[in-house]
C-alpha cells in the first residue's frame, strides 16, 4: 500500500514522526511539503493551522483523492475541533490528538467505532470515538524528506521534539490542551540517534521545541537541570553549538546552570513568551508569570551573556489602551535584542477561542476599526497595535534600527495578513460553535 504524507509548506516534525511510524510498519510511505494531487492509496494531511481548513489547494487535493477512490485522513493540531475539519474538508476521518498509535489502526482497518481517537461522518452524523491514547515516547526514526536542508523555520531546518506537555496553561496556547500539562520526555539516547539521522539527511541547524525547552525530563513540575544540560551538550556534540538553538523558555523555568548551558551549547539566544506588559492582561491570558518575573529573567540572561528575544500578543479581548501602553513601556525598558509581535489568535480548543466566542464583535479588537494615528491605513485596532509595536520595538533595540520604507511596508503587510487570517479563523469558529 502506498501512503503520501503532506504537511503544507513546512514539513513539521509531527508529520515526519507519523511518516516514520507508517514506514516502520512496512508501508511504502513518502512525505512532502508540496500540496499536490497524489496517486497514493492513502493521503494523510498533517495540518497545523486553522488557515489550512480554508486552503483551496488542500480542498482540491482531498477532492481529487476521493474522486479517484483513494482514502484521505487529516491529523495535527487542527484536530482540536474535528467538526470544523470534517465540515470544511470532508476527509474520510480525522485523527484527534496524538496520532502515532491511532494512525496505524486507521490505515489498516479504516474508520471504525473501535478505534479510539478518531472522528468521521456516518449517515450524516459525526462519530467521535473518545480521546486518542497518549503516544509512547519511544518511536521509530522520523521519515525525513530529501530536501529537509532547504527548509527554514525561524532559522532552523527542523524543530525536534524532546518532550511533550507543558506545565503552563496559557489561554491562547494549544500545547497543554493537545499534549497535556504533565511532561513526558524522550530518552537522550533516542534524541541523539535522531539528531544524527537529521544531520546525515542534510540538516544544518536544529532547534528544540516542546513549549519550554528546560522542562525536558522534569517530573511533577520540577525541572531536571542536569538532564537538560546533558541534552544540550549531546546535541551540540553532534551538530556544533552554532547549529543548535533552544529558544522557547518560560521566564520561571530558568536557573543559572540552565542559562550557562544555553550560552555554552547553543547559538546563545533565549526566547521568552512575554506577551504583555500589563499584569491584568497576563492574568486574563492565564500566563502564570508577572511582569517583575519577566524583568528579572531578562536581567539574568544578560548577566549570563545571552541575547534575549521576546514575543508579545496584542489585541487580546479586554486589552485597553492603558494595557497596550504598558506593553510599549515594557519593551522600551527591556530593550530586547529581538521582538516578535502577534495579534491574538483564537486557536480552536483554547480558552481564548471560548472567550472570543463569548463576546460581541464590538468588544473584539480584531473587528474594531482603528481611529487613531494609523486611521488612513484602514487597520483594525488589533492590527494597528501590532503595527505600532513592531515599529516601537525597532526604536528600542540595543542596536538602533531605522525603519525605512521597505520595513514599514513589510510590517504593514504582515499585520494585514495576520488580521485577515484571524478574521477568517474566527468566522470558522463561529460557524461551528
Ligand atoms: S508556557 Fe509556552 S508552551 Fe506552555 S502553555 Fe504557555 S505558551 Fe504554551
Predicted regions and their residues:
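C-terminal accessory regions of radical SAM enzymes
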Residues: 5, 9-10, 19, 325, ...
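Flexible glycine/acidic-rich beta-alpha junction loops that bind and position SAM and/or redox cofactors
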Residues: 82, 168-171, 205-220, 280, ...
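Conserved, mostly hydrophobic/aromatic
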Residues: 118, 166, 170, 191, ...
Amino acid at each position: 500500500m502506498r501512503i503520501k504524507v503532506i504537511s503544507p509548506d513546512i514539513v513539521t516534525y509531527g508529520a515526519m514522526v507519523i511518516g516514520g511510524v507508517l514506514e516502520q510498519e512496512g508501508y511504502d510511505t513518502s512525505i512532502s511539503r508540496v500540496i499536490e494531487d497524489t496517486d497514493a492509496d492513502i493521503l494523510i494531511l498533517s495540518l497545523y493551522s486553522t488557515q489550512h481548513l480554508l486552503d483551496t489547494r488542500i480542498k482540491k487535493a482531498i477532492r481529487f483523492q476521493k474522486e479517484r477512490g483513494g482514502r484521505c485522513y487529516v491529523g495535527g493540531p487542527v484536530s482540536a475541533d474535528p467538526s470544523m475539519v470534517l465540515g470544511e474538508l470532508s476527509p474520510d476521518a480525522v485523527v484527534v490528538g496524538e496520532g502515532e498509535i491511532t494512525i496505524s489502526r486507521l490505515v489498516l482497518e479504516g474508520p471504525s467505532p473501535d478505534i479510539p481517537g478518531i472522528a468521521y461522518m456516518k449517515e450524516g452524523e459525526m462519530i467521535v470515538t473518545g480521546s486518542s491514547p497518549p503516544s509512547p515516547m519511544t518511536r521509530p526514526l522520523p521519515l525525513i524528506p530529501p530536501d529537509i536542508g532547504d527548509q527554514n523555520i525561524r532559522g532552523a531546518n527542523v524543530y525536534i521534539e524532546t518532550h511533550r506537555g507543558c506545565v503552563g496553561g496559557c489561554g491562547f496556547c494549544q500545547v497543554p490542551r493537545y499534549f497535556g500539562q504533565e511532561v513526558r520526555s524522550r530518552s537522550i539516547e533516542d534524541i541523539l540517534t535522531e539528531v544524527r539521522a537529521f544531520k546525515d539527511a542534510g540538516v544544518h541547524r536544529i532547534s528544540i521545541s516542546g513549549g519550554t525547552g528546560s522542562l525536558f525530563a522534569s517530573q511533577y513540575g520540577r525541572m531536571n537541570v542536569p538532564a537538560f544540560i546533558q541534552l544540550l551538550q549531546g546535541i551540540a556534540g553532534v551538530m556544533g553549538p552554532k547549529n543548535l538553538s533552544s529558544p522557547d523558555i518560560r521566564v520561571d523555568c530558568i536557573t543559572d546552570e540552565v542559562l550557562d548551558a544555553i550560552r555554552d551549547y547553543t547559538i546563545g539566544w533565549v526566547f521568552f513568551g512575554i506577551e504583555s506588559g500589563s499584569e491584568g492582561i497576563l492574568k486574563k491570558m492565564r500566563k502564570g508569570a508577572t511582569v517583575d518575573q519577566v524583568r528579572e529573567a531578562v536581567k539574568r540572561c544578560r548577566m549570563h551573556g545571552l541575547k534575549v528575544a521576546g514575543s508579545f500578543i496584542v489585541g487580546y479581548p479586554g486589552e485597553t489602551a492603558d494595557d497596550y501602553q504598558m506593553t510599549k513601556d515594557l519593551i522600551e525598558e527591556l530593550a530586547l535584542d529581538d521582538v516578535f509581535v502577534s495579534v491574538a489568535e483564537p486557536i480552536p480548543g483554547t480558552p481564548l477561542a471560548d472567550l472570543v466566542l463569548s463576546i460581541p464583535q464590538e468588544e473584539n479588537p480584531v473587528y474594531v476599526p482603528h481611529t487613531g494615528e494609523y486611521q488612513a491605513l484602514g487597520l483594525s485596532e488589533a492590527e494597528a497595535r501590532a503595527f505600532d509595536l513592531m515599529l516601537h520595538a525597532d526604536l528600542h533595540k540595543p542596536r538602533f534600527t531605522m525603519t525605512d520604507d521597505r520595513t514599514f511596508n513589510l510590517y504593514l503587510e504582515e499585520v494585514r495578513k495576520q488580521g485577515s487570517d484571524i478574521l477568517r479563523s474566527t468566522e470558522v469558529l463561529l460557524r461551528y460553535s
